[in-house]
């Protein structure tokens, strides 16, 4: 059946558009228990399926650089007319920020003491020789009044924490609101890429301080060692689905700056083996090593033990697979999950042998800052 479906679509070499119809993909973090059957971790606390694959026959693509909007349909011009009419309605819709005071309040946050206690436990596991690095996360929970729309939360997050792999998805009564900076994996014309992020510093209050923080980050032996470890993990993951000898690091340890943090980023690529299907690619790389640790399976088990609550969408993925098998999938970090009046978010960081617990807690706050600022701008007391 899969082969018949794939044969219906021909690759259009003339198009520059990444998507001309295909499938939308959502993967919850707990999908790892289906990929690695021996892993047992806490179940997701959210009313969401573990994974979704939804057929998408119509799409809107916004080329921000060229300032062009493309309306796409596999079926008919009538579908495009419907999309166009929807856009006209949106253009006439008025937005308001009135009556939002006292609309958001924090109800729970993993305390600094609690987080630092678990950082120390990760370090203990490292010295016991069980792991080399683990990406421990910290939880914030809020009550948000219903008059605050999901779209408003997302629009504010796009302002306070603009990122290249952002998205909003409504699934039943749940909404995932993400401003992720990280790609898990992409595939185009048999070239597969992953772009690991590991190593963080907060943005400086002045230009000079920003430059100094970037210099300190890229020269940090701790951060470089952690990053190299995770690049090797990603190379190993890609090697499972790539032609022998084709995997390479084509961009090594560059600084990328976002609204609230600086990151060290690399790019790992390879040539995919013939007849490898999207499911095999996902099984090879999911969940990403940068948000679990090394070795991946043991880290996932330890993180489940320490965090105690399932992650759900956090550090899962969303993205697309197009009709001829190419794909682009993110890692759901800098992400909020909303269900009714309940809203939660997580932020984490990599723990290594010489980690300082207080600094690791500060890093989670720097990473959460864009999301917290979005809530505060609406009204956060």
Enumerate the language-model features and the residues they cover.
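Extended alpha-helical targeting/anchoring segments
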Residues: 1-381
């Amino acid at each position: 059946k899969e082969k018949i479906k794939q044969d219906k679509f021909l690759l259009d070499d003339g198009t520059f558009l990444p998507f001309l119809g295909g499938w939308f993909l959502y993967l919850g973090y707990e999908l790892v228990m289906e990929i690695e059957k021996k892993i047992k971790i806490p179940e997701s606390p959210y009313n969401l399926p573990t994974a979704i694959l939804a057929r998408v026959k119509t799409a809107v693509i916004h080329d921000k650089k060229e300032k062009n909007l493309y309306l796409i349909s596999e079926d008919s011009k009538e579908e495009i007319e419907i999309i166009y009419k929807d856009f006209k309605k949106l253009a006439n819709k008025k937005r308001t920020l009135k009556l939002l005071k006292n609309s958001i309040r924090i109800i729970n946050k993993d305390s600094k003491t609690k987080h630092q206690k678990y950082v120390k436990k990760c370090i203990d596991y490292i010295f016991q020789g069980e792991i080399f690095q683990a990406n421990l996360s910290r939880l914030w929970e809020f009550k948000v009044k219903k008059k605050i729309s999901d779209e408003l939360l997302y629009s504010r997050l796009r302002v306070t924490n603009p990122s290249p792999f952002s998205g909003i998805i409504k699934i039943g009564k749940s909404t995932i609101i993400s401003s992720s900076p990280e790609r898990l994996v992409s595939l185009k014309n048999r070239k597969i890429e992953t772009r690991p992020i590991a190593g963080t510093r907060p943005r400086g209050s002045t230009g000079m301080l920003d430059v100094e923080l970037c210099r300190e980050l890229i020269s940090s032996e701790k951060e470089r060692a952690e990053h190299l470890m995770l690049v090797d993990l990603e190379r190993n993951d890609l090697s499972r689905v790539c032609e022998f000898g084709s995997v390479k690091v084509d961009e090594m340890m560059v600084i990328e700056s976002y609204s609230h943090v600086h990151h060290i980023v690399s790019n790992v690529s390879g040539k995919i083996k013939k007849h490898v299907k999207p499911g095999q690619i996902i099984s090879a790389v999911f969940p990403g090593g940068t948000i679990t640790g090394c070795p991946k399976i043991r880290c996932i088990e330890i993180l489940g033990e320490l965090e105690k609550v399932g992650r759900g969408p956090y550090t899962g993925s969303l993205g697309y697979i197009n009709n001829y098998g190419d794909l682009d999938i993110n890692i759901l970090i800098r992400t909020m999950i909303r269900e009714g009046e309940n809203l939660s978010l997580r932020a984490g960081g990599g723990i290594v042998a010489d980690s300082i617990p207080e600094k690791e807690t500060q890093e989670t706050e720097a990473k959460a800052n864009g999301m917290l600022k979005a809530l505060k701008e609406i009204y956060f007391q």
